[in-house]
Amino acid sequence: MERSKLPRYICPTLAVVLPLVLCMVVEGATTSKNDNQGEAIGYGYQVKNAKVDNSTGKSLTALLQLIRNSPVYGPDIHFLSFTASFEEDDTLRIRFTDANNRRWEIPNEVLPRPPPPPSPPPLSSLQHLPKPIPQNQPTTTVLSHPHSDLAFTLFHTTPFGFTIYRKSTHDVLFDATPIPSNPTTFLIYKDQYLQLSSSLPAQQAHLYGLGEHTKPTFQLAHNQILTLWNADIASFNRDLNLYGSHPFYMDVRSSPMVGSTHGVFLLNSNGMDVEYTGDRITYKVIGGIIDLYIFAGRTPEMVLDQYTKLIGRPAPMPYWAFGFHQCRWGYRDVNEIETVVDKYAEARIPLEVMWTDIDYMDAFKDFTLDPVHFPLDKMQQFVTKLHRNGQRYVPILDPGINTNKSYGTFIRGMQSNVFIKRNGNPYLGSVWPGPVYYPDFLDPAARSFWVDEIKRFRDILPIDGIWIDMNEASNFITSAPTPGSTLDNPPYKINNSGGRVPINSKTIPATAMHYGNVTEYNAHNLYGFLESQATREALVRPATRGPFLLSRSTFAGSGKYTAHWTGDNAARWDDLQYSIPTMLNFGLFGMPMIGADICGFAESTTEELCCRWIQLGAFYPFSRDHSARDTTHQELYLWESVAASARTVLGLRYELLPYYYTLMYDANLRGSPIARPLSFTFPDDVATYGISSQFLIGRGIMVSPVLQPGSSIVNAYSPRGNWVSLSNYTSSVSVSAGTYVSLSAPPDHINVHIHEGNIVAMQGEAMTTQAARSTPFHLLVVMSDHVASTGELFLDNGIEMDIGGPGGKWTLVRFFAESGINNLTISSEVVNRGYAMSQRWVMDKITILGLKRRVKIKEYTVQKDAGAIKVKGLGRRTSSHNQGGFFVSVISDLRQLVGQAFKLELEFEGATR
């Protein structure tokens, strides 16, 4: 809230009373002018009536009346229906709609959600409107529920306003009380211009999200415009609207309660600018409705649990998707991709999935194979060989269907009438195959068509997943606007491409029509989302195979269907660093399976850059090397230094595969990211809020990469506690409070540390995930003097679509470790043990880190069906050695079945009985 405007309030104890009652001096009409029009953008609304539903106490409805019309950006809508409702105890929904006319909003069948409470009756059925509230008697209407910490206050001022705050702290989370002299703070509601603004405490609010944009920092910088309009703009361009739209932000407060976090989501698919100045956030939307959700949190994990409960939990990914992937645009033929696979094997670098870009197609047409360079028989042999080796194959698809009249896919599409139309005919665009029509994925017939085409292709070539690209949708031409149309040329110009470029530029025109008489203007940002839905539907048939899908264009909720990569980055050191904020942002957007093109896509990479990039990229949730044609090849085996680093870091990644897969299970269960900012684990450490060069995998493994050329030192932030290096377990960082430390990082090394209090189940290194899954488990236990150590391991067949669901083909193991004065206990609990027992998975070794004394086995018991059985220690070896002030103890030759609960008691050397 702007302190300079405080005279408009007449409450003497503003700081205390504001969340409960706002006393506003109502001034005359605003004199703030729009720079271009010479008149105010709008004058706001006043409350005509407001009522809390006393039967539930969970909703409030009101009718709002326009104060005065303004012609800027078109005429205002005169009457608005307003509702505020508790969707859940921790989720408050705020909705403004036209009281008399239905407006576009995302269909419930596209993004399922609970219905809002009934709106006030339309004006035609209102017999008597209440008289205007006298301006000298401002009142409030409060919505509060005993089960929620959130409360809503509606201010009957002129113009009206509202706040959402925490009852426990009186911290205002969303403050839409207007400044009477400033129309940019008013609610404005026109057909093609909607405005909603909230003041923010600039020094206490730390905002993240509102993508997709490439930025150097994870935390949003002040004084910027964030535009949401899906566009085929290379991601090496900073601060421009890119492939996806995610109108969600998370706000972590540094006071009054440090680390208190909430989320804000505007459910709207139309183009928009979000202006963020630090002390204010303002939405400027060119259509739809205002449908705002506030998630109470109050931790970051709780916010994402609440957010993904609404938009959809992240899809489970097959186990093999966590392996290493290789791709390039420009592979000449099937012989070249076979050679690439062979050379990875010769170099002993793990390779899980081979990809092909558009090169494999016949003249770039979907669902075809180049008969000369990628003939069907050779491709079938190639995929068969991959599968025999435990490897996979994923090709690319673009949505544009070439209009060649002899092309079977086009013929069937025309017969089914499935393409987007303009002026009554299929809209003709142009992409890689030349002239194309675009399937209308809002049309059930188009979804069926797409599913059938994928089935036809999979029937001849057993692909393992699909990569969908160019689905913003991209168009190589810009069609002329329809004369006089305010859709192709809206009155408010969003900051498209950073220069208010027309929204028709290089995409489907806004006047094109979808199924159900929906305009492209309204549905544009949903195109990639809808294609992801249809493509995943195709991939779940047959249902016995876990689907994998990667999409460039995304929207809120896309994580329910697809993974994502950061798009066309460049082989630049800046892009290496930018990949971290983008990865962390997509974790917030409910898309935890995220990564960047390792070594860079555009431009030619260098040996040093590629070496440092694979060191970082090995820890992306989605880890893929991808490059553009006409650039230097960058397969990891081409430089010995890169190959050596790849063997090391991918070896560690494959050891950590059970950990990554367990994190994916948690993401599907609660919406938690796989790659996380340091602030997620350390929300009370304000210094972590601005860190964009390090990240966590899960809650306890910290990655601190080299991001500058020629550097052999990393100035890394170390939150409080003990951190042990995962490269050798022998070096550690111990700090009582968070501080920056200098870490050695020679060219072949990346710093990866595990924090005290964590237990991680690992398996052995291997060339494929299939081979890694057959190796014994190794339990890594990091002890803490302050908390018990814990960890989890989720196990299933690696391709389940209903992960952890009914049917019993899964096991969850929880691990615990705690030390006393003379002893230490490590134990496990097993949920649904039958599946793990049937697989006969074995844990062979336990490594204990962070000990201050040597230990030896005192007692070892396992849980049998008949009860706990004491096991003699014969055959089990315990070794300890001191490194860096801590002992490392290894208990080997355990042969412990993972599906069997156990308890291991260890005695400290020199302990008295």
From Swiss-Prot:
Q: What are the annotated glycosylation sites?
A: N54, N404, N495, N517, N728, N823
**What is the organism field in this record?**
Beta vulgaris (Sugar beet)
Q: What does this protein do?
A: High activity for alpha-glucan.
What molecular functions are annotated in GO for this chain? alpha-1,4-glucosidase activity; carbohydrate binding
Q: Where is the composition biased (Pro residues)?
A: 112-123
User: Record's InterPro entries?
Assistant: Gal_mutarotase_sf_dom, Glyco_hydro_31_AS, Glyco_hydro_31_C, Glyco_hydro_31_CS, Glyco_hydro_31_N_dom, Glyco_hydro_31_TIM, Glyco_hydro_b, Glycoside_hydrolase_SF
What would be one Pfam family of this protein?
Glyco_hydro_31_3rd
**Which residues, if any, are the signal sequence?**
1-28
Under the heading PANTHER family, the entry gives: ALPHA-GLUCOSIDASE, P-TYPE DOMAIN-CONTAINING PROTEIN
Q: Which PROSITE patterns match?
A: GLYCOSYL_HYDROL_F31_1 (PS00129), GLYCOSYL_HYDROL_F31_2 (PS00707)
Matches recorded under Gene3D superfamilies: Glycosidases, glycosyl hydrolase (family 31), Golgi alpha-mannosidase II
Q: Which reaction does it catalyse?
A: Hydrolysis of terminal, non-reducing (1->4)-linked alpha-D-glucose residues with release of alpha-D-glucose
Swiss-Prot/TrEMBL GO biological process terms: carbohydrate metabolic process
Q: What is this protein called?
A: Alpha-glucosidase
Keywords assigned: Glycoprotein, Glycosidase, Hydrolase, Signal
